[in-house]
Amino acid sequence: MTDFFGYGSLVNLQTHQYLNPRPTKIKGWKRKWVSSNIHDIAILSVSPCDLTILQGMRASTKNIGWKALDLRETGYIRHSLDNYNMQMYIGDPEYIDHKIKKPILLSYLDCVIQGYYKHFGKQGVKRFFKSTENWDHPILDDRNAPQYPRATILSKFEFNLVDEHLERL
């Protein structure tokens, strides 16, 4: 099994060079913000939910391998999605702090939303915000000095798209 399912920054193809990327959906998982003790910020993770269909990106590790992706996804563990013949990363419970709400880096969210907009359009962005839980984490505006290591350059329209959805929360 060499394919993975990305539901956050891996949806944005500017952040990686894995093979054969294509938009896809999986059923039975919901996305949520969790506090990471490794990164000292909020990260996206998933948990089981029979009612949810999650949009994301499927790609193959054949060209770079799992080791490089495992390193990128430090603080996550791989989980097999046997019904889909692929794997995805889930926030490692050992490194998640449920007692505190660490901040969501705006540069991270911008990167994620840029990917969703490019591959799923405005409706995909809307679904991302609606299908993601734990928006009660503070937002850290680091756009002028991005802390996210794979921050991307957004258009004014994309910045506004993120800001408009945050205002509606």
Task: Give a label for each model feature.
Residues 2-169:
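A glycine-rich, hydrophobic/aromatic-adjacent loop/helix-cap motif
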